[in-house]
Design a protein with these regions (language model features):
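Structural recognition of an alpha-helix C-terminal capping motif at a helix-to-coil junction
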Residues: 44-51, 65-77
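Core residues of bacterial helix-turn-helix
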Residues: 23-26, 46, 53, 139-142, ...
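Arg/Lys-rich amphipathic alpha helix in sigma70-family domain 2
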Residues: 36, 58-62, 73-94
């Protein structure tokens, strides 16, 4: 039994240390993915995702990549639910960072802290068609393999590879056009 299998079994038994290991492994990628795809509700969505993971963990079976793919599948479903609800309500919650709180770091500090990753993700979203951007974000931010992304997006692995290839070519052309690369 490899390391991930042992951690998964312990987490399914309810061992807190094992749940913490799984959380620490996936959380940064999941948080960044949600912040990029749904910045106004990322924290709430992340909480819902982890609640669903906790509820379904005992039934999960698979390896490390399958686990990450499962978590990101849950995240995509929660985003879709959020978007449907938001359209019906026609409101969007304001993130805590945008509220004017005395003593809180200013927006400049928050932006400077997260600028490079957020700017890159925003560039990807602004430059690419939605399907290509989603493939790149799931592959890069999610750290998922082609097969996992294909399963999440309900596409064939070959289609995911083609979308990724086209996306990278388009990003390269955009970067060369702005003088960022040689």
């Amino acid at each position: 039994m490899d390391g991930f299998d042992a951690v998964l079994k312990a987490a399914q038994r309810g061992d807190e240390w094992a749940v913490a290991v799984l959380y620490r492994d996936v959380r940064p990628r999941l948080a960044r993915f949600l912040e990029v795809r749904e910045p106004k509700a990322a924290e709430d969505l992340e909480g819902e995702v982890w609640l669903a993971v906790a509820q379904g963990l005992a039934r999960f079976s698979g390896g490390e990549e399958s686990f990450r793919a499962w978590v990101f599948s849950i995240a995509r479903r929660r985003m879709a639910d959020f978007r449907r609800t938001a359209v019906r309500r026609a409101t969007f919650p304001a993130p805590t960072e945008e509220l004017d709180r005395p003593g809180a770091p200013g927006p400049e500090a928050i932006v400077l802290e997260e600028l490079s990753a957020d700017a890159a993700a925003e560039f990807v979203i602004a430059t690419l068609p939605a399907d290509q951007a989603e493939v790149v974000l799931l592959r890069v931010l999610g750290g998922l393999g082609v097969n996992e992304v294909a399963e999440i997006l309900d596409k064939r692995p070959g289609t995911v590879r083609v979308l990724q290839h086209r996306a990278l070519r388009r990003l390269h052309a955009a970067l060369v056009g702005t003088g960022v690369t040689r």
